[in-house]
Each structure stands twice: as structure tokens, then as C-alpha cells.
Amino acid sequence: MHQKITSLLAAVLAVLLCSCGGQPSQQPNLPETPEEAPYAFTLDYHRCAPLVERQIGSDLAAAARLVVDAFLAGETSVTLPEGDYSGNPGNDLGYALNSMCPVFGAVTDYDDNHFDKAARTVTWAYTQTPEQIQEALAALEQTTAAYMSVLRQGDGETARALLLYHALTEPAAYDYEMEHGDGDSTEYQFRTSSYAALVLHSGICYSFAQALAFLYTQAGLDCAAVMGDSETAGLHMWLMAAVDGKWYYFD
């Protein structure tokens, strides 16, 4: 009501000034309503979507957070506490990290062979210099903030999902060169990472699926990248996300 009254008074004042031959001054900038304020966002590499945690288990989600901390500290290994690491924990760990800390998969040689179940250790080597890694982390932080800048406090889950989807996919380009590249090469690991999709706007199907998973997770949307056979593209990865109580596929 206060804002409406202020606007009405400003309009009346402008009319009075014009009728007297005066020039109205610029209407004062009114404060943003809470709903119009920028979305409150803090980058957190520990965030793991609830659906992902249910898929891999809470022990492995906790392991992913330990790996993130060790990676950010410049270390090359971590010893995990006792827990449930059944199945293929090396693959599941990498899967979680792609949507939690995209830089990790882009600048290390990690794959499922680097998870030693017997010793409960995870190891990796860096494929870029410390300076390059810090530049990549800074670039991801800046880019993520730019993505989140399209959101407002009043945006519900549907608005957040659609706005972030558009922000990611509008400049996106498919990396056809890497579609059949050497999966063991450093170049392939970097160019098909979720980091490349986020910062360089380039990648293949799972680059963008995991990149969108990262953005949705940071924005408080439950989601998980899923893989299956596509009628037109063969083996494919896309995103499944919960939006306002319903599950949707995003591709």
C-alpha cells in the first residue's frame, strides 16, 4: 500500500509540474520488494541432491564431500572412514562429484579405478597446474553467479527450473569432435566435463546433464542425471528433476 501511494503521489506531482510549465524530476527509485530481490545464493561444493544421495548412499555422499575438501586443499588422496561402499563406488563417486564440484572431473585423472575398496582410499593426479586449477575454480564461481543472477527471491521451483535451463542451454554448443574422442585422454576428460558445459558452453550429452544437475542442486532443486537408450541417439544422459511435487525430464 505504501508503495502504491508513493507512486500515485509522484504521478500527481508530475502532472502538476507539467501544467505549470515545469519539468518533472525523475521518479525516485522505489525499493525492491522481497520477491524481486536477487536470489540468495552461496556456492557450496558440499551440496548433494537428495535423489543422488539416495542413489549412491549417505556414506558415499559423505565420501564425496571429503574428496572435495582434499581437492580444494591441493591434495591427491583421501582415506575414507568405514562405511557402505558396495557396488561400484568408484563410478558412483565420480557421478556425484560431477554435479557437486564440476572442476574436479575437469582437471584430474579420476576414474572408477582410483577407488580402492579394500584400503578405502581415493586417489587422483592433476592434469593442470595449480595456477590453472585456481583459474578454473574462479571461472566456475563467476559463471555460476551469472547463472544464478537470473533468479529472484520470489521465484518458485518452476521458475527456477525453467530460467536456469534456458540460461544453460541458450548458448550451448554440442562438441561433435569429442563424441567419438579418446575417452582416456586428458583432453576428452576436460572437454566432456560438466565444467566445460558450464563455463565454455560446450560438451556432450552428459556434460550438460551433469551441468544442469549442478545448477539445480545449487538452487535447491532435487534432481539426478539419468542414463538410458534414446530412440534417436542411442545411449544418452539427461536430467530428472522434481518441480513443484512432480518429476520431469530435462534434455
Feature annotation, model-predicted:
Residues S207-D251:
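Hydrophobic/aromatic-rich core segments of domains that either
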Residues L66-V67, L200-G203, M227:
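Alpha-helix capping and helix-loop boundary segments enriched in small/acidic/polar residues
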Residues C20-T143:
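Linear, non-domain "peripheral" regions
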Residues G183-S185, G203, F214:
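Extracytoplasmic/periplasmic C-terminal soluble domains
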Residues H2-Q23:
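Sec-dependent N-terminal signal peptides of Gram-positive bacterial secreted proteins and lipoproteins
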Residues I133-A197:
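Secondary-structure boundary elements
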Residues T129, E170-D175, I204-C205, D229-A233, ...:
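Solvent-exposed loop/turn segments at secondary-structure junctions
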Residues S194-F208:
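A short, highly charged nucleic-acid-interacting micro-segment common to nuclease
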